[in-house]
Amino acid sequence: VSIQQLERFRSLSPAEFFYRNKEIAGFSNPARALYQSIRELVENALDATDSYGILPVIKVSIDSGIIPDKPEVYLISVEDNGIGIPPDNIPQAFAQLLYSSKYVLRQTRGMFGIGVKMAVLYSQITTGKPVEVLSSTINSSRIYMFRLSIDIKNNRPVIHHKASFKKSSEWHGTIVKLFIEGDWNRAKSRIYEYFKRTAMIAPYATIVFKDPSNNVIYFKRSTTLMPKPPREVKPHPHGID
């Protein structure tokens, strides 16, 4: 075998791998991508609230016609009243794959630090626009805003803009806004069903959803009783070498 025929080897960053294989995370077409983005953002919002003993209030909207001549591009906005994210962690939390607060032995809805970043990555691939994140922690006097994208080759966040504002209320939580190429007509039945089922399994949550036709669905919490927040635990002795 000549030297010219030898195979060449190279490594891929996690971001580059999922960029090439986005269907693995459920982003195989515009309809599934719209549904999966909503699901990832809402489940992050629930984890930021009920995992810390906060009764969730989650507001979701999907808007169309934001970009002229591109009716297939939608703006997704999800707001929660959770614990918020410290500003130093916001870029990595939304724009670095395999970076997460969930790499602990504690039950949460996500495990791998991939979901919301895949929504950001798909948004970046299909629209070229950064994600916008606003967040404030419970005891903070300020709201922090970032516009971010992912450096796919190096799996690092790219900060396009950042700012902070003095809070005029006691609000705490996170707001995420991202543009995405989607197919509302094909995805809407799954999205409506997802909200109905989420309201059933989390009856302590208030969820407000506005669709692209400006129809508003309001799921009012039916109880204030919540399951105890999960605790981080030590590994089981059987799994220790």
Regions found by a protein language model. Name each.
Residues 2-5, 89, 100-235:
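GHKL-type ATPase core
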Residues 18, 41-44, 58, 115, ...:
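Conserved structural-core and active-site-/substrate-pathway-adjacent residues in large, well-folded domains
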Residues 93-97:
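Mobile ATP-lid/nucleotide-binding loop of the nucleotide-binding subdomain
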Residues 84-86:
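A short glycine-centered beta->alpha linker in the GHKL/HATPase_c
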